[in-house]
């Protein structure tokens, strides 16, 4: 009998998850020396599992990587104190400000390894060690991302232990940057076993947390043996094939050193500096180093290249800045038609000003006297020895000069100089034939003429005419020289000049950027004469992308754009991108979307306003040995309108519907998270036309790692003393962050408006008044800031407009950013305050908006010394615009424990009339007030506090909201206009998730019911929550009612909708009662449900004031599935009618045979699997449960607490 379709996946999950089963696919029993050696000997690569990486990572796609999403990949904490490493996500296990999101997923559901805060009085070190690894190739590179929460970690080190020696591959220096930072270190050739260790050290004064994520081992495996090699390749003794240029290059490419044996390389002249300089001559400036770098010399190499050991020797330049150290070779005889090749290893780190140059100095009669520059490397190449090679053909005797010049805080190093067998010293051939007549070679020149300082200007200054332009004014997009020389090598170029516009290659791998002619290129279709920048082969040993950079640039203006022509012909792994390098951070500004098939295309990139210094970098990767003549090129690079003083007509266009472009608005560049100009993405439609453009911030974008994103206007001159900025915003998603509006003026920033959390799947209008000093012409900027404190949802903006004059009163006011134009009156004084310090003289400890002490509200002191008994203090709004239909104004109010008096509410239209009077109950709870409003003219609302003459009393207001439609009854809502009095505040302890509001007619990226229950059509609305965002074992989202009075018996009636794809996916909906007595679960439904609306009724009883809570959570495997609510009705003082039969208790027609057959099969499985299978069957299935309380509530003796230990705040209490 076939297995029932819904039992098979459950059985698989059971077998995989049972503690007695350890199922690992297809072990091929590789020998111990073949395990964790970066080579997949098993077909499924199981011999490389739990090696500090896995054989394949579906998230990263790197060959050997660990993202910590499933497990620690074999990494083990070996700390000897309580300061230790652990696997964590969202800072849940750390006592301190750990990362709120990982690097892999960029959300709070992703995992990483972290070490928490240190409480001890002495320094402690937390160590995380890899399993034993074996045989790293010379090209091996470890790439990872690290995060320091508060920038105060004393030290982070990456160490490699091999035999009795422990090498420090990298050690943190200087201040920590914000967010996740990338780190890449090379291991060098490691023979035999080794381990990698991450060590974090702190002392008693340092706090914060450090985390690691996305470890990747690149190009670490040795080549595999081959029966036959491609033509021209060398067949090693161990049957490995290596390319001919890898012979005698100072590296063990074969893995058995047979490519470096004396038989092959005996005639090469190799200098490793272990015993001296060999045949090379030293001038002042080079020092042979016997000790690796340490804390006193953080930029120096920590190991040599020859031995890959801290005990090895190498050369470093110790010359004074501005004075190069020169190393000269022996004199060589003319090479004739054969190439004299020099392989050398260079180390440039710690400074962008470091430089290593290789010159050819010809000798003898008739030879040119000036040295010829053959190779130059400048800038930061990282903490690695980088291979290079130069081939020399000379008709004259010659010398090779190596000139090293250090920059501030940097180092230039040399190791392993290897001259090929065609480099024949003069002393070697002099015994065979006499030297030609003529003068002897002169001493090497200290500097070639091309590198001498110009005129009398200081080092780094540019001489033009009578000017000495300082370095900070070079490439600042403002011409200082009459001929513009200071802006000529600043990125703009057609590559016809050899200077290439200042672009300089900084590649360290097997690819490089090189200026070539069109005839040289085989990858592009260009046929005309000319030059461009092209990806070409290089001599580096590392498998890294090619990089080429501009000099230091900036500052730039908001209109700055880069225009370029490019081609890309590549397989899927290849790419071409433009990166902005700013103060150590790297921002992806542009990427070729697809291969151009070798056809030249043009594009432009908005760079925007940036501080100095920044650099532009083209990054490329292609497989030049792959099929289809792969390649990439860049030409006609132009930087336009980059001066900060450049203005255009568009700069004054603050009002914008984003249909044509973004007008005067441009994205900030402080992080990798950006606002993007899009069409019908995120929100399914724009606000202007329903089919047009808007600007979008999506925190789920793969590259959105930054904490916030800025959208700025260009500087504006006030058109009037008061202006009104209006805009439409869309803030939607189960865990979306905060949207803010601010104004910058003269270095100060003023917050004008903000919203947090989902506002429903619709566009909302908002406005803010811009106040300027009369007669002032000081420019200002407007700033929309999207905070990435949530990871599921979208933010969008559309239809921004500015007009003279003040704005209407806002429809919503939380008092978080301002007093919303309210003005005090009467005897007392209302004021806006927060209780963050805990020392406020009066007022509630927390606000209602955020339910934290940092939140703001309006409060008035009603104590006798501030407001005598019977006296009033009024708070009057600005004018509201006329209403086209009846509306409901809701607000939350709070009274002191001792009687605060009375709160009256008035409406001012043609006259003033009272619409509401509330006796402000004492207690710790915020309470909801509501009033129906009809106004055909402009109107105001007035809140008036009447003092009761009681000391230490107050009245507070928060969260005023004006919505269309009549006010609902307490605890009831049909969700047609919104959530009514139900609060969906995201609780951080539950993961920060929120219920949302939407309807079937509005497309959403989240699943939802096609129709509501109220109208039964897609035009209706409901509250819903998508449980799939919670993840495995996830937390919950709450929808809470307003505080309701104690009741002996009342009825809660509602309709709910649940839909999940399979039976073993399980969403849960619960009804909780929350009061000062605790939390009680009174109803719940879980498991698979038909996609239809179902009715539920719950008897409610509580001896204390309480709130009703709808809790949505996920009880099983993650799955896309919504839980929705509609037509919630709270019938105070009424018993529920007899509930309809639960659909969970009704068998579906035709299901009996399947059940019987499944039962028989399960019976056989029980015999085989024993008690473990029976336990699983007992847990299988889920039915609605309901707990009916009696009229005399017996107390919360069966209090329900969440498994994650969330402590819920006492938001309601009883009256005193």
Curated annotation (Swiss-Prot):
It is found in: Membrane. Residues 23-1151 are extracellular. Residues 1-22 form the signal peptide. InterPro entries: ConA-like_dom_sf (IPR013320), LDL_receptor-like_sf (IPR036055), LDLR_class-A_CS (IPR023415), LDrepeatLR_classA_rpt (IPR002172), MAM_dom (IPR000998), MAM_domain-containing (IPR051560). Keywords: Disulfide bond, Glycoprotein, Membrane, Protein transport, Repeat, Signal, Transmembrane, Transmembrane helix, Transport. Residues 434-449 have a biased composition (Pro residues). It comes from the Eukaryota. One of its GO terms (biological process) is protein transport. Residues 26-53, 228-266, 456-491 form the LDL-receptor class A domain. The chain crosses the membrane at residues 1152-1172. Residues 64-222, 269-425, 491-644, 654-809, 811-969, 971-1138 form the MAM domain. This is Apical endosomal glycoprotein. It comes from Homo sapiens (Human).
């Amino acid at each position: 009998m076939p297995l029932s379709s819904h039992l098979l996946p459950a059985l698989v999950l059971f077998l995989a998850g049972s503690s007695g089963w350890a199922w690992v696919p297809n072990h091929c029993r590789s020998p111990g020396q073949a395990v964790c050696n970066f080579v997949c000997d098993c077909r499924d690569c199981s011999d490389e599992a739990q090696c500090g990486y896995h054989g394949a990572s579906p998230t990263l796609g790197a060959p050997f990587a660990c993202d910590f999403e499933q497990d620690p990949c074999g990494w083990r904490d070996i700390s000897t104190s309580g300061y230790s490493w652990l696997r964590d996500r969202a800072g849940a296990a750390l006592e301190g400000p750990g990362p709120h999101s990982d690097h892999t997923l960029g959300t709070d559901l992703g995992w990483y390894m972290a070490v928490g805060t240190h409480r001890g009085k002495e320094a402690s070190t937390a160590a995380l060690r890899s399993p034993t690894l074996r045989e790293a190739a010379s090209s091996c590179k470890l790439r990872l991302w690290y995060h320091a929460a508060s920038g105060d970690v004393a030290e982070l080190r990456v160490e490699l232990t091999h035999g009795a020696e422990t090498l420090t591959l990298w050690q943190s220096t200087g201040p920590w940057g914000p967010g996740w930072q990338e780190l890449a270190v090379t291991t060098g050739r490691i023979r035999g076993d080794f381990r990698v260790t991450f060590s974090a050290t702190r002392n008693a004064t340092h706090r914060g947390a450090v985390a690691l994520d996305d470890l990747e081992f690149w190009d670490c495996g040795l080549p595999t043996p081959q029966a036959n090699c491609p033509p021209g390749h060398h067949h090693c003794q161990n049957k490995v094939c290596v390319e001919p240029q890898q012979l005698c290059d100072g590296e063990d490419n074969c893995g058995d050193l047979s490519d470096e044996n004396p038989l092959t390389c005996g005639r090469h002249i190799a200098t490793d500096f272990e015993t001296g300089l060999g045949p090379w001559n030293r001038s002042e400036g080079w020092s042979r180093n016997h000790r690796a770098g340490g804390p006193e010399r953080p930029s120096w190499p920590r190991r040599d290249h020859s031995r890959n050991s801290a005990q090895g020797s190498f050369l470093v330049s110790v010359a004074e800045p501005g004075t190069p150290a020169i190393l000269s070779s022996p004199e060589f005889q003319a090479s004739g038609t054969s190439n004299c090749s020099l392989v050398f290893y260079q180390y440039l780190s710690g400074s962008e000003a470091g430089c290593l140059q290789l010159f050819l100095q010809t000798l003898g009669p008739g030879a040119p006297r000036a040295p010829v520059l053959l190779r130059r490397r400048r800038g930061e190449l990282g903490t690695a020895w980088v291979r290079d090679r130069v081939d020399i053909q000379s008709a004259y005797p010659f010398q090779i000069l190596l000139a090293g010049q250090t920059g501030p805080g940097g180092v230039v190093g040399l190791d392993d100089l290897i001259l090929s067998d065609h480099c024949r010293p003069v002393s070697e051939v002099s015994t065979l034939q006499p030297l030609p007549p003529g003068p002897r070679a002169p001493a090497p020149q200290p500097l070639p003429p091309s590198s001498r300082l110009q005129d009398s200007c200081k080092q780094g200054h540019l001489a033009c005419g009578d000017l000495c332009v300082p370095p900070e004014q070079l490439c600042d997009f403002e011409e200082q020289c009459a001929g513009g020389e200071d802006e000529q090598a600043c990125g703009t170029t057609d590559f016809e000049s050899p200077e290439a516009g200042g672009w300089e290659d900084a590649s360290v791998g097997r690819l490089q950027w090189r200026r070539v002619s069109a005839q040289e290129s085989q990858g592009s279709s260009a046929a005309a004469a000319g030059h461009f920048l092209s990806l070409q082969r290089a001599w580096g040993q590392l498998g890294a992308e090619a990089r080429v950079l501009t000099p230091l640039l900036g500052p730039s203006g908001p209109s700055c754009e880069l225009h370029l022509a490019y081609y890309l012909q590549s397989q899927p792994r290849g790419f071409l991108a433009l990166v902005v390098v700013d103060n150590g951070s790297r921002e992806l500004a542009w990427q070729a979307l697809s291969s151009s098939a070798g056809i030249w295309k043009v594009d432009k990139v908005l760079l925007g306003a940036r501080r100095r210094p920044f650099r532009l970098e083209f990054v490329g990767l292609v497989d030049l040995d792959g099929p289809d003549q792969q390649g990439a090129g860049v030409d006609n690079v132009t930087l336009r309108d980059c001066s900060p003083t450049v203005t255009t007509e568009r700069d004054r266009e603050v009002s914008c519907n984003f249909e044509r472009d973004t007008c005067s608005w441009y994205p900030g560049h402080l992080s990798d998270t950006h606002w993007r100009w899009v069409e019908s993405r995120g929100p399914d439609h724009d606000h202007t036309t329903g089919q047009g453009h808007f600007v979008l911030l999506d925190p789920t974008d793969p590259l959105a790692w930054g904490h916030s994103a800025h959208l700025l206007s260009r500087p504006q001159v006030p058109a009037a003393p008061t202006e009104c900025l209006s805009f439409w915003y869309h803030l939607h998603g189960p865990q979306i962050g905060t949207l803010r509006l601010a104004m910058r003026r003269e270095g100060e920033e003023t917050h004008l408006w903000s919203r947090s959390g989902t506002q429903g799947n619709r566009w909302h209008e908002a406005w803010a008044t811009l106040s300027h000093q009369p007669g002032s012409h000081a420019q200002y900027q407007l700033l929309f800031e999207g905070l990435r404190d949530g990871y599921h949802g979208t933010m969008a903006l559309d239809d921004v407009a500015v007009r003279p004059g003040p704005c209407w009163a806002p429809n919503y006011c939380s008092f978080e950013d301002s007093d919303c134009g309210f003005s005090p009156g009467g005897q007392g004084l209302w004021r806006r305050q927060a209780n963050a310090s805990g020392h406020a003289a009066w007022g509630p400890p927390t606000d209602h908006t955020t339910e934290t002490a940092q939140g703001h509200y309006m409060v008035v002191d009603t104590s006798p010394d501030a407001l005598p008994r019977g006296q009033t203090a009024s708070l009057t709004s600005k004018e509201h615009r006329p209403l086209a239909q009846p509306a409901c104004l809701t607000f939350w109010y709070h009274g002191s424990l001792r009687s605060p008096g009375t709160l009256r509410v008035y409406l001012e239209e043609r006259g003033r009339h009272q619409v509401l009077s509330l006796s402000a109950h004492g207690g710790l709870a915020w309470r909801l007030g509501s009033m129906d409003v009809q106004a055909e003219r402009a109107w105001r609302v007035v809140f008036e506090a009447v003092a009761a003459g009681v000391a230490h009393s107050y009245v507070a207001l928060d969260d005023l909201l004006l919505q269309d439609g009549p006010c609902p009854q307490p605890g009831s809502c049909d969700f047609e206009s919104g959530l009514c009095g139900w609060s969906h505040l995201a609780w951080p302890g539950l993961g920060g998730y929120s219920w949302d509001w939407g309807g079937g007619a509005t497309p959403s990226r989240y699943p939802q019911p096609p129709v509501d229950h109220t109208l039964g059509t897609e035009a209706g609305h409901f509250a819903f929550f998508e449980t799939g965002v919670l993840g495995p074992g996830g937390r919950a989202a709450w929808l809470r009612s307003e505080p309701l009075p104690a009741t002996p018996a009342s009825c809660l009636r509602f309709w709910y909708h649940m839909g999940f794809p399979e039976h073993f996916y399980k969403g849960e909906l619960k009804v909780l009662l929350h009061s000062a007595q605790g939390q009680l679960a009174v109803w719940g439904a879980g498991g698979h449900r038909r996609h239809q609306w179902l009715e539920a009724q719950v008897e409610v009883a509580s001896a204390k004031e309480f709130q009703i809570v709808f809790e949505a959570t996920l009880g099983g495997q993650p799955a896309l599935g919504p839980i929705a609510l509609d037509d919630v009705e709270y019938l105070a003082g009424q018993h529920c009618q007899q509930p309809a039969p639960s659909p969970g208790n009704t068998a579906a027609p035709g299901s009996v045979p399947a059940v019987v057959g499944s039962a028989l099969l399960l019976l056989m499985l029980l015999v085989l699997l024993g008690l473990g299978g029976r336990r699983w069957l007992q847990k299988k299935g889920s039915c609605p449960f309901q707990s009916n309380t009696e009229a005399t509530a017996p107390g919360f003796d069966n209090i329900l607490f969440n498994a994650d230990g969330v402590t819920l705040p006492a938001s309601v209490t009883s009256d005193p």
